[in-house]
Swiss-Prot record:
Annotated residues for binding of Mg(2+): D71, E141
Entries under InterPro entries matching the protein: Class_I_gatase-like, CTP_synthase, CTP_synthase_N, GATASE, GATase1_CTP_Synthase, P-loop_NTPase
The name this protein goes by in its record: CTP synthase
Misc remark: CTPSs have evolved a hybrid strategy for distinguishing between UTP and CTP. The overlapping regions of the product feedback inhibitory and substrate sites recognize a common feature in both compounds, the triphosphate moiety. To differentiate isosteric substrate and product pyrimidine rings, an additional pocket far from the expected kinase/ligase catalytic site, specifically recognizes the cytosine and ribose portions of the product inhibitor.
Active site: C380 (nucleophile), H506, E508
Catalytic activity: UTP + L-glutamine + ATP + H2O = CTP + L-glutamate + ADP + phosphate + 2 H(+); L-glutamine + H2O = L-glutamate + NH4(+); UTP + NH4(+) + ATP = CTP + ADP + phosphate + 2 H(+)
GO biological process, alphabetically ordered: 'de novo' CTP biosynthetic process; pyrimidine nucleobase biosynthetic process
Organism whose genome encodes this protein: Chloroflexus aggregans (strain MD-66 / DSM 9485)
Disulfide bonds: none
Alphabetical UniProt keywords: ATP-binding, Glutamine amidotransferase, Ligase, Magnesium, Metal-binding, Nucleotide-binding, Pyrimidine biosynthesis
């Protein structure tokens, strides 16, 4: 019988439920249990694929091509499991499914209501994940904050599941914030009110995770336990830590892992967290600082690139390097030039993105890395920018571009994929998900991966224009990764350069703590070597031609 853990949040949004869920999954997996995870998002969008990163942050792409909440990235990285489109459900999806069934006549003329039709659809999605994953434990995070009107159908559905699957097979965890006032005193009243709001919809929390930026003493735990009607053992302090990867160990040391196993009636097995403890020990070690520039469109909101950031850290931790990310707005590069803004960095990364705003700054950054021998990693749009920059150099003209930004460009080295030309809808229509890529022996990409074929996750409509393949290759561009039919260019690189590699896919989605992605590992290693060499010379060297 599958066990279910439902995680809600109170007091404020962004209280850390996603990291908490991911950490709980890690504790259960360390005890030998199989785990799957679901995020229930209360917004009416079908998925975040068409949402602004400023509204939602990163869109995380699953192997089966779903555009999902960034929390799924945390789940995958912490638990080291590949999730699917079943793991992210939105209110938009639920209502769309129910209305479609009503239009087909599935409800036989009945009046469609939130209860039971919407709640039944929510429960069906949870059950579908449990059946398909065959997991011992399914953890479900309910987005938003208890008290929000948008979350009510989800809360009602998980309340009903207590009866559907049996009380012994369900655990409710509530994550709250303990704010402090100017005297330094932590206040429990918001948590008490949040627990009461949860009770008002028929749910009594079994565990309270208390977020705070300072230690929580036993008196406060006992007070919360009294008002929430839970064991003191079930009031778990979660202080702010230096690294999110410390959270599973904090929860384990507070006894949460054993408590969950006990309450769910699972076999009591000791956790194997040695690899995780070794990871955290490496994070805490003193390391050489390595400045890396991330040149993007949404750099004001770091969550827009959260998987890229984590992938950089994974590779840096392995090599005992403290990566110092310099957040560079691409529009600033356009105004001020790359030499001024990229001075003193030893690696340049241009991540994925869409739209014309800031594109010339990204192209200039890619060209600056090429000219000055600074290690470069381009991801998706970052690969297209590198292609445009190189082609402008080879063809001797600035009139080289992607048709996404200039449909009338004389040299469209990046063009819309043929199977995208008749598509008018935006949502869920790109080239999405896992696709194979054949690597060319003797290239940096092949050496980094150490194999002939890989599978990577994609999210794009535009691709390298094969009309320019021959002329660019003859000028020194190395095409090191291709689709199996050899029609799609997946990786490009430059041979006489410390590291200039760019991929059409998103390698960041498959990086894991303790198992960094090969392209990020190679990039960080090359940047570290450039740092050592740079101590004997002044960086940067010269302005790029594209600035």
């Amino acid at each position: 019988m599958t066990k279910y853990i439902f995680v809600t949040g109170g007091v404020v949004s962004s209280v850390g439920k996603g990291i908490g869920v991911a950490s709980i999954g890690r504790l259960l997996k360390s005890r030998g249990f199989s785990v799957s995870v679901m995020k229930l998002d209360p917004y009416l969008n079908v998925d975040p694929g068409t949402m602004s990163p400023y509204q939602h942050g990163e869109v995380f792409v699953t192997a089966d091509g779903a555009e999902t909440d960034l929390d799924l990235g945390h789940y995958e990285r912490f638990i080291d499991v590949n999730l699917s489109r079943l793991s992210n459900v939105t209110t938009g999806q639920i209502y769309s499914a129910v209305i479609a069934k009503e239009r087909r006549g599935d409800y036989l003329g009945g009046t469609i209501q939130v209860i039971p039709h919407i709640t039944n659809e929510i429960k069906a999605r949870i059950g579908s994940l449990a059946r398909s994953s065959q997991a011992d434990v399914v953890i479900v995070e309910i987005g938003g904050t208890v008290g929000d009107i948008e979350s009510l159908p989800f809360l009602e559905a998980i309340r009903q599941m207590r009866k559907d699957v049996g009380r012994d097979n369900i655990l409710y965890i509530h994550v709250t914030l303990l704010p402090h006032i100017s005297t330094g005193e932590l206040k429990t009243k918001p948590t008490q009110h949040s627990v009461m709001a949860l009770r008002n919809v028929g749910i009594s929390a079994d565990v309270i995770l208390c977020r705070a930026d300072r230690p929580i003493d036993d008196d406060i735990r006992e007070k919360i336990a009294f008002f929430a009607d839970v064991d003191v053992r079930a009031v778990i302090p979660v202080p702010t830590v230096d690294s999110i990867y410390e959270v599973p160990l904090v929860l384990e040391d507070m006894g949460l892992g054993d408590y969950l196993v006990e309450r769910l009636g699972l076999p009591a097995t000791p956790p194997d967290l040695e690899d995780w403890r070794s990871l955290v020990a490496r994070i805490r070690q003193e390391k050489r600082r390595l400045p890396i520039a991330l040149v993007g469109k949404y750099v004001e909101l770091h969550d827009a690139y959260i998987s890229v950031v984590e992938a950089l850290h994974h590779a840096a931790i392995e090599q005992l390097i403290d990566v110092d990310i310099r957040w560079i707005a691409a529009e600033d590069v356009e105004r001020e030039g790359p030499a001024r803004l990229l001075s003193g960095v030893y690696g340049i990364l241009v991540p994925g993105g869409f739209g014309e705003r800031g594109i010339e700054g990204k192209i200039a950054s890619a060209d600056y890395a090429r000219v000055n021998g600074i290690p470069y990693l381009g991801l998706c749009l970052g690969m297209q920018c590198a292609t445009i920059a190189f082609a402008r150099h080879v063809l001797g003209t600035h009139d080289v571009n992607s048709t996404e930004f200039n449909p009338q460009t004389a040299h469209p080295v990046i063009d819309l994929m043929p199977d995208q030309r008749d598509i008018t809808e935006k949502g869920g229509t790109m080239r999405l998900g896992l696709y194979p890529c054949d690597l060319v022996p003797g290239t940096r990409a092949h050496a980094a991966y150490g194999c002939d074929r890989v599978e990577e996750r994609h999210r794009h409509r535009f691709e390298f224009n094969n009309r320019y393949r021959a002329v660019l290759e003859s000028a020194g561009l190395v095409i090191s990764g291709l689709s199996p039919d050899r029609q799609l260019v997946e990786i490009i690189e430059l041979r006489d350069h410390p590291w200039y590699v760019a991929s059409q896919f998103h390698p960041e989605f498959q990086s894991r703590p303790g198992k960094p992605h090969p392209l990020f590992r190679g990039f960080i290693a090359a940047a570290a070597q450039t740092l050592l060499a740079g101590e004997a010379r002044q960086l940067p060297l010269v302005e790029s031609a594209s600035s």
